[in-house]
Amino acid sequence: MFRYLTAGESHGPQLTAIIEGIPAGLSLSEEQINIDLARRQCGYGRGGRMLIEKDQVEILSGVRWGKTIGSPITLCVRNRDWENWHEKMSPHERFHDDKIRVTRSRPGHADLPGAMKYNHHDVRNILERSSARETAVRVAVGAVAKALLSQFEIEVCGFVAELGGIKAIRPSLPLAALKDMAAKSELFTYDKSVEEEMKRLIDTVRDEGDTVGGVIEVNAVGVPPGLGSHVQWDRKLDARLAMAVLSIQAFKGVEIGIGFQAAASTGSKVHDEIFYDSARIAHGEQSGFYRKSNNAGGIEGGISNGEEIVVRAAMKPIPTLYKPLRSVDIVSKEPYEATVERSDVCAVPAASVVAEAVVAIELADAFMVKFGGDSITEIKRNYQSYLDYLRAF
């Protein structure tokens, strides 16, 4: 089982993650994790904080001489902005100052419901942890998950599929080619024809003091049939993926495969017919069974079926606006325009990296549940035995 916890506030000294369940013998370096951290900080429409922070991970435990040793892995991402906040966010009582309390809650954020739940009269106690800054360390965890999955030729990649109603058309190309296209795009999209239109929209929205959302898509190839389970609600792979993606700040909807389109069609047009060709095995495929369509998005009955995993999710516009919405002061109860925190105009490209990370984490967990062992060597042996079984099935 692959599990993790994160800790840390947006303007605290650091973000921390502890990962348990990574087998011994996995090659892992700070450099490979930092690649994904840098991707998260890119993308057209990001805000001023990206000029301050240059995220770098520190591996504090669980890795020796470039290899995991089987014990919990501790990851740390320092907040460079901490030097400007060390008194405001200090754990020490001597720095307490009621004059810097934030009492104007922002619509669309956790500010008000969080303050009500935890009996806080300073919403900074809520907004610091609810901030999407937390996703930096989740991306680091996702990089570890991707390192594990890559040992078994499973690849995960996220893209921007839509921005502010402008839809990208996915080319019929292998995932590796789409990944290369997105890497060259400021918006992490696979459709270059709409990129300039998307950028113009972001510029317009910025000038208006507003924000814009979109739709991300995460694909995974090489996933074998048999991950997840139908026998309990909380082991269904699609349910796990949906929960993980919806846990990302500002995400409000998720679908697997064609998702909501299926509700407007008939069963004969939705369900993917099953075929068999023994020649596929000779060409290195995992199984002779296959589909000619993938409306299910690679998951049926909560179990991966061997086709490409396709997850799409909706991200709402960021609720921190430079043209703030009306709100109410939680102490005086007087109406005000909501507090303005430094923010992005559009974080959909960055969110595609975060979604990629959490999908990889869930796939790594499902993979370890199915093939788990204490070392990479043991897991590879287990996995090879399963592949031999599938080809004979």
UniProtKB/Swiss-Prot annotation:
Cofactor: binding comment: Reduced FMN (FMNH(2)).
Complex and partners: Homotetramer.
One GO cellular component, as annotated: cytosol
InterPro entries reported for this sequence: Chorismate_synth, Chorismate_synth_AroC_sf, Chorismate_synthase_CS
Annotated positions binding FMN: 129-131, 249-250, 301, 316-320, 342
Alphabetical UniProt keywords: Amino-acid biosynthesis, Aromatic amino acid biosynthesis, FAD, Flavoprotein, FMN, Lyase, NADP
Enzyme class: lyase
Enzyme Commission number(s) of this protein: 4.2.3.5
Residues annotated for NADP(+) binding in this entry: 40, 46
Reactions catalysed: 5-O-(1-carboxyvinyl)-3-phosphoshikimate = chorismate + phosphate
Protein family: Belongs to the chorismate synthase family.
Pathway: Metabolic intermediate biosynthesis; chorismate biosynthesis; chorismate from D-erythrose 4-phosphate and phosphoenolpyruvate: step 7/7
Classification via Gene3D superfamilies: Chorismate synthase AroC
Source organism: Geotalea uraniireducens (strain Rf4) (Geobacter uraniireducens)
Cofactors that this protein relies on: FMNH2
Gene Ontology molecular function terms on file: chorismate synthase activity; FMN binding
GO biological process: amino acid biosynthetic process; aromatic amino acid family biosynthetic process; chorismate biosynthetic process
Function field: This reaction introduces a second double bond into the aromatic ring system.
Protein name, as recorded: Chorismate synthase
